[in-house]
Each structure stands twice: as C-alpha cells, then as structure tokens.
A protein has these predicted regions:
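Residues at the start of alpha-helices and the adjacent loop-to-helix junctions
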Residues: 1-2, 279
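Acidic, Ala/Val/Gly-enriched low-complexity intrinsically disordered segments
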Residues: 2, 6, 11-14, 28, ...
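Surface-exposed, charge/polar-rich loops and edge strands
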Residues: 30, 41-456
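Structured catalytic/translocation cores of nucleotide/phosphate-coupled proteins
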Residues: 3, 22, 39-41
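Cationic, low-complexity basic patches in intrinsically disordered or flexible, solvent-exposed regions
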Residues: 12, 19-22, 27, 34, ...
Length: 456
C-alpha cells in the first residue's frame, strides 16, 4: 500500500476546547422521551432521532495507517489472513485473526486464540505505536474503488437505540459468531472494526462532508487491492451531532454480528460495573454511516454442489414450472426477476414468469427469496442455506467468472448469478421489521479494521 502523507502525526494530539461542549451529550440523551409499543414493536415519542457521539479514537500515525489497516475479519479465512499478514508485523489481522500466529490445528474459539489477540493488540499499541486522541471527535471516511466513491461519518452509536430499533436491522445473527466477537471485544476492551450503517441521505450532511474534505486528511493511502482510503478529523463534531438529530433512523447495512456482539459485551460490562450511568463507552458501538445514495450493493451469488439426485432433464422440468429458460443466456442478469444459471459448460437465462411472481413489496419478492422459494428448496432440497453444506456463496467482486470456474472444475454442479438487491429494498424490509434471507447483500468496497478503534 502507498501512503500519501508526508508527515507523521504527533503522539499527543490536541484539539479545540470547543469539543468540551460535548460533555452535554449525556444530558441530551437523558432528556429524550421514549416509549415502546410492545404490541406492534414500534417506537413512539415526541422526537424520533438516532444520535451519534464523538469518541477518542485509538489509531495509528498517518504514515503507518496503510500497514495497519486490514480487511474485515469475516471476509477471509485463516489461510488468506495468514498470507495477507505475512511479513507485516503491523497488520491488524494479527489482532482480528490471531490464530494466524498459532499452530494450524488450533481451535479458532479456544482460550489461546483470545490470549494471542490480547498479546498482539498490546504489542501493536507499543510497536506501531497506536495513538489515543486526547479529545472526542468525529471523522469522515472516504473509499474510492474505480469510478465508485462513497464517504461516511465515523462516530459511535447508542446500543440503547440499537435495542429500541432506532438503528434498524434486516438480518438474523448466529449465536456462535456473536460468541466469538463478544469475547474478542471483552478481551481487548475495544471495538476494532466498525459497523456499516446507512441513512436516507441529507443535503445538509452532504454539504458538511464536502466542506470537511477540503482540509488535510489524517490518513490517505491506497491498499494493495487498489482501493483508496482517506480519513479526515471533523473540526466541529457538534455540527454533525445536531445534523443527525434530523435523521429519523439509521440502518445496519453490514455488520449485524458486530452490533449484536457490542450489545452483548455491554450487558456483561454493565453487570460488572459499579455505579453504571449509561454514559460509559461500552454503551456505544463504533460505526461508519454512509448516505444511502452512495452505497454500492453487489450480487451475492450461489453455487450448488449437486442436483439433489435429479437428472439434467428432471432439473429443467422443475425450473420450467416457474421460469422461462433460455439457452445460451447471459452470465449476469440485467433486471430483477432474471437469473443467470451455469450448468454443464453453458450459461442459461431464467426469467420468472408473471404467473409465478410473488406479491411486490414483500421479502418474498426479493430475487434471493425467489431463487430460494422456487429453486433451491423445492427442486434442490436446500431448505436452510445457513447450515446446508451443499451450497456455497460467491460474493460481489468474484463475479460470474468464479461461478464458471467452480462448475468447470467440478467443485459445483450448477451456479446461479443474481441481480443485486436494491438499497430501497433493504430500507423497506428494515422499516417493516422483516428479515432478509441470509447472504442477500454484498457491499463493496469494504471498510478496513484497525484505523479507528473504540476503547470500551
């Protein structure tokens, strides 16, 4: 990775005394009146808003940011993490995937793994060194991938508001994944990777972000995958806090397990705390919040290892009950309700027939649901994609070429490419309190871990 910062940030970073005004934050939090309608699961109060909070980040100096930053822990396996961190002792993967520094046979959820995470974290703090911002702040984080650019606000969000559904969800979580990240947070007493949130865009916030990016950045580097990462410290965070009070709801785009783990860690730390006030750092979780019109969702494709005992002819007969099937089709769908299917060396196009289409505006109308309800479950016998070992998921950037490779090499019998889920679908499903099928969305570019750490 290439750094474009000429100077190292001083170890002690001093901010304007204006930030001390934010001591009043907890008073604002306490003054808001909130009641929950348990029958409908909806919030009722005089003013519905989601509040953001500045925090004193633990972070690398500017000229080390590119070395420290790592991809999210959950998008790579141990072997990939070990390869990425090779010959780079500052890579945050030594903290987020500490098993890479232990023998191959190590149980990923055993005590030695979490001990190694703590040891590596303390070593990184000393060797990098990581610096603690003296005063709470808010940051802007810009990612550029090719022609795509998005910029979001880095701040902490309230776990109370997560619990109360002011921060809305669209995905179920798995207990085993929660267990892992909860323990990781408690051992480190830190949240090291942000939750990816979104909101319905605001012209006021867009203008404020544009003004902030005119100043010098604290981080500016290009990662090995050619994605540019730039972070600015906001000089007047109170303006952003006030602006977000006009935003009714925040939505989890990616990071449901991180958010759920932060809530569980808070419950445990609250239990251990004497004189809990609700203003402790463990009551908030680290997030990057992007406007919905900048977020890029890519397809999350599927590959199946067999045809569930069916012959090719029987399989096609099953498909024709719901789809028009075209041979020599496209590898990438052009619209909703259309699917690419690679089977026996050829691409086919599946187009959902009108008489088989579910009602619009529901979870069942999503393409991931249509594929599940019309093909995977009734024809191929995949009833639970969360646990069935016969299905693999191919996200985002790997595209149709990866699907073709899996089938051509005999690692899959058939593969399906999907049209990407739309952001409006995600917001609508979240607003309705519904749950999307697993692996419905793949977001690119990916945020990096280790750049701005929230200590709890």
């Amino acid at each position: 990775m290439v750094s474009r910062l000429a100077k190292t940030t001083p170890e002690r970073i001093v901010f304007s005394n204006k930030l001390l005004q934010f001591i009043n934050f907890k008073q604002a939090m306490r003054s808001r009146k909130l009641s929950v309608d348990n029958r409908r699961g909806q919030l009722r109060r005089e003013e519905i808003v989601a509040v953001i909070r500045p925090f004193s980040a633990l972070r690398p100096p500017g000229d080390r940011a590119g070395e420290v930053a790592s991809v999210p822990y959950d998008v790579i396996n141990t072997e990939e993490a070990r390869a990425l961190a090779a010959n780079n002792p500052l890579s945050f993967l030594h903290v987020s995937r500490p098993e890479i520094d232990l023998p191959d046979a190590t149980d990923l959820h055993s005590d030695p793994v979490y001990r190694k995470a703590f040891e590596n974290f303390e070593k990184l703090i000393k060797d990098c060194p990581l610096l603690t911002e003296e005063a709470p702040s808010i940051y802007l984080y810009r990612l550029i991938m090719g022609d795509h650019e998005q910029i979001g606000v880095v701040a902490c969000c309230s776990i109370d508001e997560y619990d109360q559904d002011l921060i809305r969800k669209h995905e179920r979580t798995r207990r085993d994944k929660e267990d892992d990240r909860t323990r990781h947070m408690l051992v480190l007493r830190a949240q090291t990777g942000p939750v990816f949130l979104t909101y319905r865009s605001s012209r006021e916030i867009d203008t404020m972000m544009m003004e902030t990016t005119m100043a010098n950045a604290i981080f500016d580097f290009t990662a090995a995958d050619s994605i540019e990462h730039t972070i600015w410290r906001v000089p007047d965070p109170v303006r952003f806090v006030h602006a977000f009070r006009e935003i009714p709801f925040l939505y989890i785009a990616d990071g449901h397990h991180r958010a759920a783990s932060a809530a569980r860690a808070r419950a445990e730390l609250k239990e251990q705390s004497f004189g809990h006030t609700g203003d402790e750092e463990y009551n908030f979780f680290l997030a990057v919040i992007f406007p919905d019109d900048q977020v890029q969702i890519l397809a999350y494709n599927r590959a199946l290892r067999d045809l569930n005992g069916l012959s090719t002819g029987e399989f096609f007969e099953g498909l024709k009950k719901s789809f028009d099937v075209k041979e020599d089709g496209v590898d990438t769908p052009k619209r909703r309700g259309q699917f690419g299917m690679y089977l026996e060396g050829r691409w086919h196009t599946l187009s959902l027939r009108a008489d088989a289409a579910p009602p619009q505006g529901t979870v069942t109308s999503l393409d991931v649901s249509i594929l599940q309800d019309r093909v995977l479950a009734p024809i191929l016998g995949i009833n639970d994609v969360r646990t069935d070992k016969r299905i693999d998921f191919v996200g985002g950037m790997r595209g149709s070429k990866e699907l073709k490779r899996l089938v051509d090499e005999g690692k899959a019998a058939v593969a399906f490419s999907l049209y990407p889920t739309m952001m409006q679908d995600l917001l609508s499903v979240s607003d309705a309190g519904e749950i999307m099928p697993p692996k419905s969305t793949w977001f690119e570019p990916k945020l990096r871990d280790g750049l701005l750490i929230h200590r709890i």
